[in-house]
Amino acid sequence: LHLSLRRQRQMCIRDSGVTETYIKEHYQLRAILEGAAARLCAAPETDISELEEIYQDSCKILENKDFSRYTDINREFHNEIWTAAGNGKMKNMISELWNGLSMGNMVSEEDYAKVSVKEHGEILEAIKAHDGDAAEAAMKEHIMRSRDDMLTYYN
């Protein structure tokens, strides 16, 4: 069943006209822009109270095993980082990328949520510590892991 499901997903990606190069370029650009947004968000003057609240909500989703809500809360977490970064042009560019390629239903919502919440926690801790380097690195790792997941289903 897993093999069959993987082949169906693989065919969906390939039938959409998306290439391996497109996936790599898409996620590379997201990593650069979202990494920069996380760095900006780590500035001491940035209000991250909303980001902390969204993260706590995502932890509750895990606790309650309400994984169907995770895709929305994931988007909220990322969107709040873009907003808190204070660069409207960057936010618009990242948002446009989010309207394109997505993991969608490539992995189970539960698996996706567990890994993502852990990584979001690492990003948030770096932001709270006002460590721009660590925030940027954690975000880039998070995005590139998503890229690797996508490529797993492509190949």
Annotate each predicted stretch with a short phrase.
Residues 49, 111-114:
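Short helix-capping and inter-helix turn/linker motifs at the boundaries of alpha-helical repeat units
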Residues 144-154:
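Short arginine-rich
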Residues 26, 30, 36, 43-106, ...:
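Conserved amphipathic alpha-helical segments that form helical-bundle/coiled-coil interaction surfaces
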Residues 1-13:
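Single conserved hydrophobic/aromatic residue that forms the stacking wall/gate
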Residues 5, 19, 116:
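Short, conserved glycine- and acidic-residue-centered signature motifs
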Residues 14-30:
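Basic, amphipathic "hinge/linker" alpha-helix immediately C-terminal to the N-terminal HTH DNA-binding motif
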